[in-house]
Each structure stands twice: as structure tokens, then as C-alpha cells.
């Protein structure tokens, strides 16, 4: 037997809830959270590519260098380049 048939029963010509505690604050909060979750899930599925494409490009840019002195930036670039150049016979790709 499904949960739907156990919770809701046909009353005259409409569907109604058998539970008397539908005004309970926890029931109302759970209903609101459930509806919001459903809406967010649908939006996530509809706009999946738009949402996650920005994350993908943002992460591939590398760490932020805002506020870092130029000498430290150059040192970081040299470390990354030396890691790539460690083995000249094979191409090494490092993504942060």
C-alpha cells in the first residue's frame, strides 16, 4: 500500500488529509521546507549547465592573487613551472 493512500483519503469529491495536526508548526515548517527543496531541485536541473559552468571556469583560473606581492606571485609561477618541467620526456599537467 502506498504512503499516499495511507495519508490521504477521498472525502466526498475532493482529496483531504486525515491528520488533525495539520496546523502543528512542525508540519507547516516541514511542508514549507519540502516545497522549497522541490523548487530548488527543479531549478538546479533546469539550469544545471549555467550554474556549474561558472564554477568550473572559476576553479580552473587558479587561486586568487589579490593582495599578494609580485615577488611571491613570481615565486609561485616558478614553482609551478618547475613542477611541469620536472620530466621533460613526458608532459605533466597540473591543475589546481
From Swiss-Prot:
It is found in: Virion membrane; Host apical cell membrane. The modification Phosphoserine is found at residues 64, 82, 93. Residues 59-88 are annotated as: Disordered. The M2 protein from most influenza A strains is inhibited by amantadine and rimantadine, resulting in viral uncoating incapacity. Emergence of amantadine-resistant variants is usually rapid. One of its GO terms (molecular function) is proton transmembrane transporter activity. Residues 1-22 are virion surface. Signal peptide: none annotated. Glycans are attached at residue 20. It comes from the Viruses. One of its GO terms (biological process) is protein complex oligomerization. Residues 44-96 are intravirion. A lipid is attached at residue 50 (S-palmitoyl cysteine). The record marks 37 as: Essential for channel activity, possibly by being protonated during channel activation, and by forming the channel gate and the selective filter. It is a single-pass type III membrane protein. Keywords: Disulfide bond, Glycoprotein, Host cell membrane, Host membrane, Host-virus interaction, Hydrogen ion transport, Inhibition of host autophagy by virus, Ion channel, Ion transport, Lipoprotein, Membrane, Palmitate, Phosphoprotein, Signal-anchor, Transmembrane, Transmembrane helix, Transport, Viral ion channel, Virion. The chain crosses the membrane at residues 23-43. GO terms for cellular component: host cell plasma membrane; membrane; virion membrane. It holds the Pfam family Flu_M2. The record marks 41 as: Seems to be involved in pH gating. Belongs to the influenza viruses matrix protein M2 family. Cytoplasmic tail plays an important role in virion assembly and morphogenesis. Homotetramer; composed of two disulfide-linked dimers held together by non-covalent interactions. May interact with matrix protein 1. When the channel is activated, one or more imidazole moieties of His-37 probably become bi-protonated. Forms a proton-selective ion channel that is necessary for the efficient release of the viral genome during virus entry. After attaching to the cell surface, the virion enters the cell by endocytosis. Acidification of the endosome triggers M2 ion channel activity. This is Matrix protein 2. It comes from Influenza A virus (strain A/Swine/Colorado/1/1977 H3N2). The lineage of its organism: Viruses, Riboviria, Orthornavirae, Negarnaviricota, Polyploviricotina. The gene is M.
Amino acid at each position: 500500500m502506498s504512503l499516499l493512500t495511507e495519508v490521504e483519503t477521498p472525502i466526498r469529491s475532493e482529496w483531504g488529509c486525515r491528520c488533525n495536526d495539520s496546523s502543528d508548526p512542525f508540519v507547516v515548517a516541514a511542508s514549507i521546507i519540502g516545497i522549497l527543496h522541490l523548487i530548488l531541485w527543479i531549478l538546479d536541473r533546469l539550469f544545471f549547465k549555467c550554474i556549474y559552468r561558472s564554477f568550473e571556469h572559476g576553479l580552473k583560473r587558479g587561486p586568487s592573487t589579490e593582495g599578494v606581492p609580485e615577488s611571491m606571485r613570481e615565486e609561485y609561477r616558478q614553482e609551478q613551472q618547475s613542477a611541469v618541467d620536472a620530466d621533460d620526456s613526458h608532459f605533466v599537467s597540473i591543475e589546481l
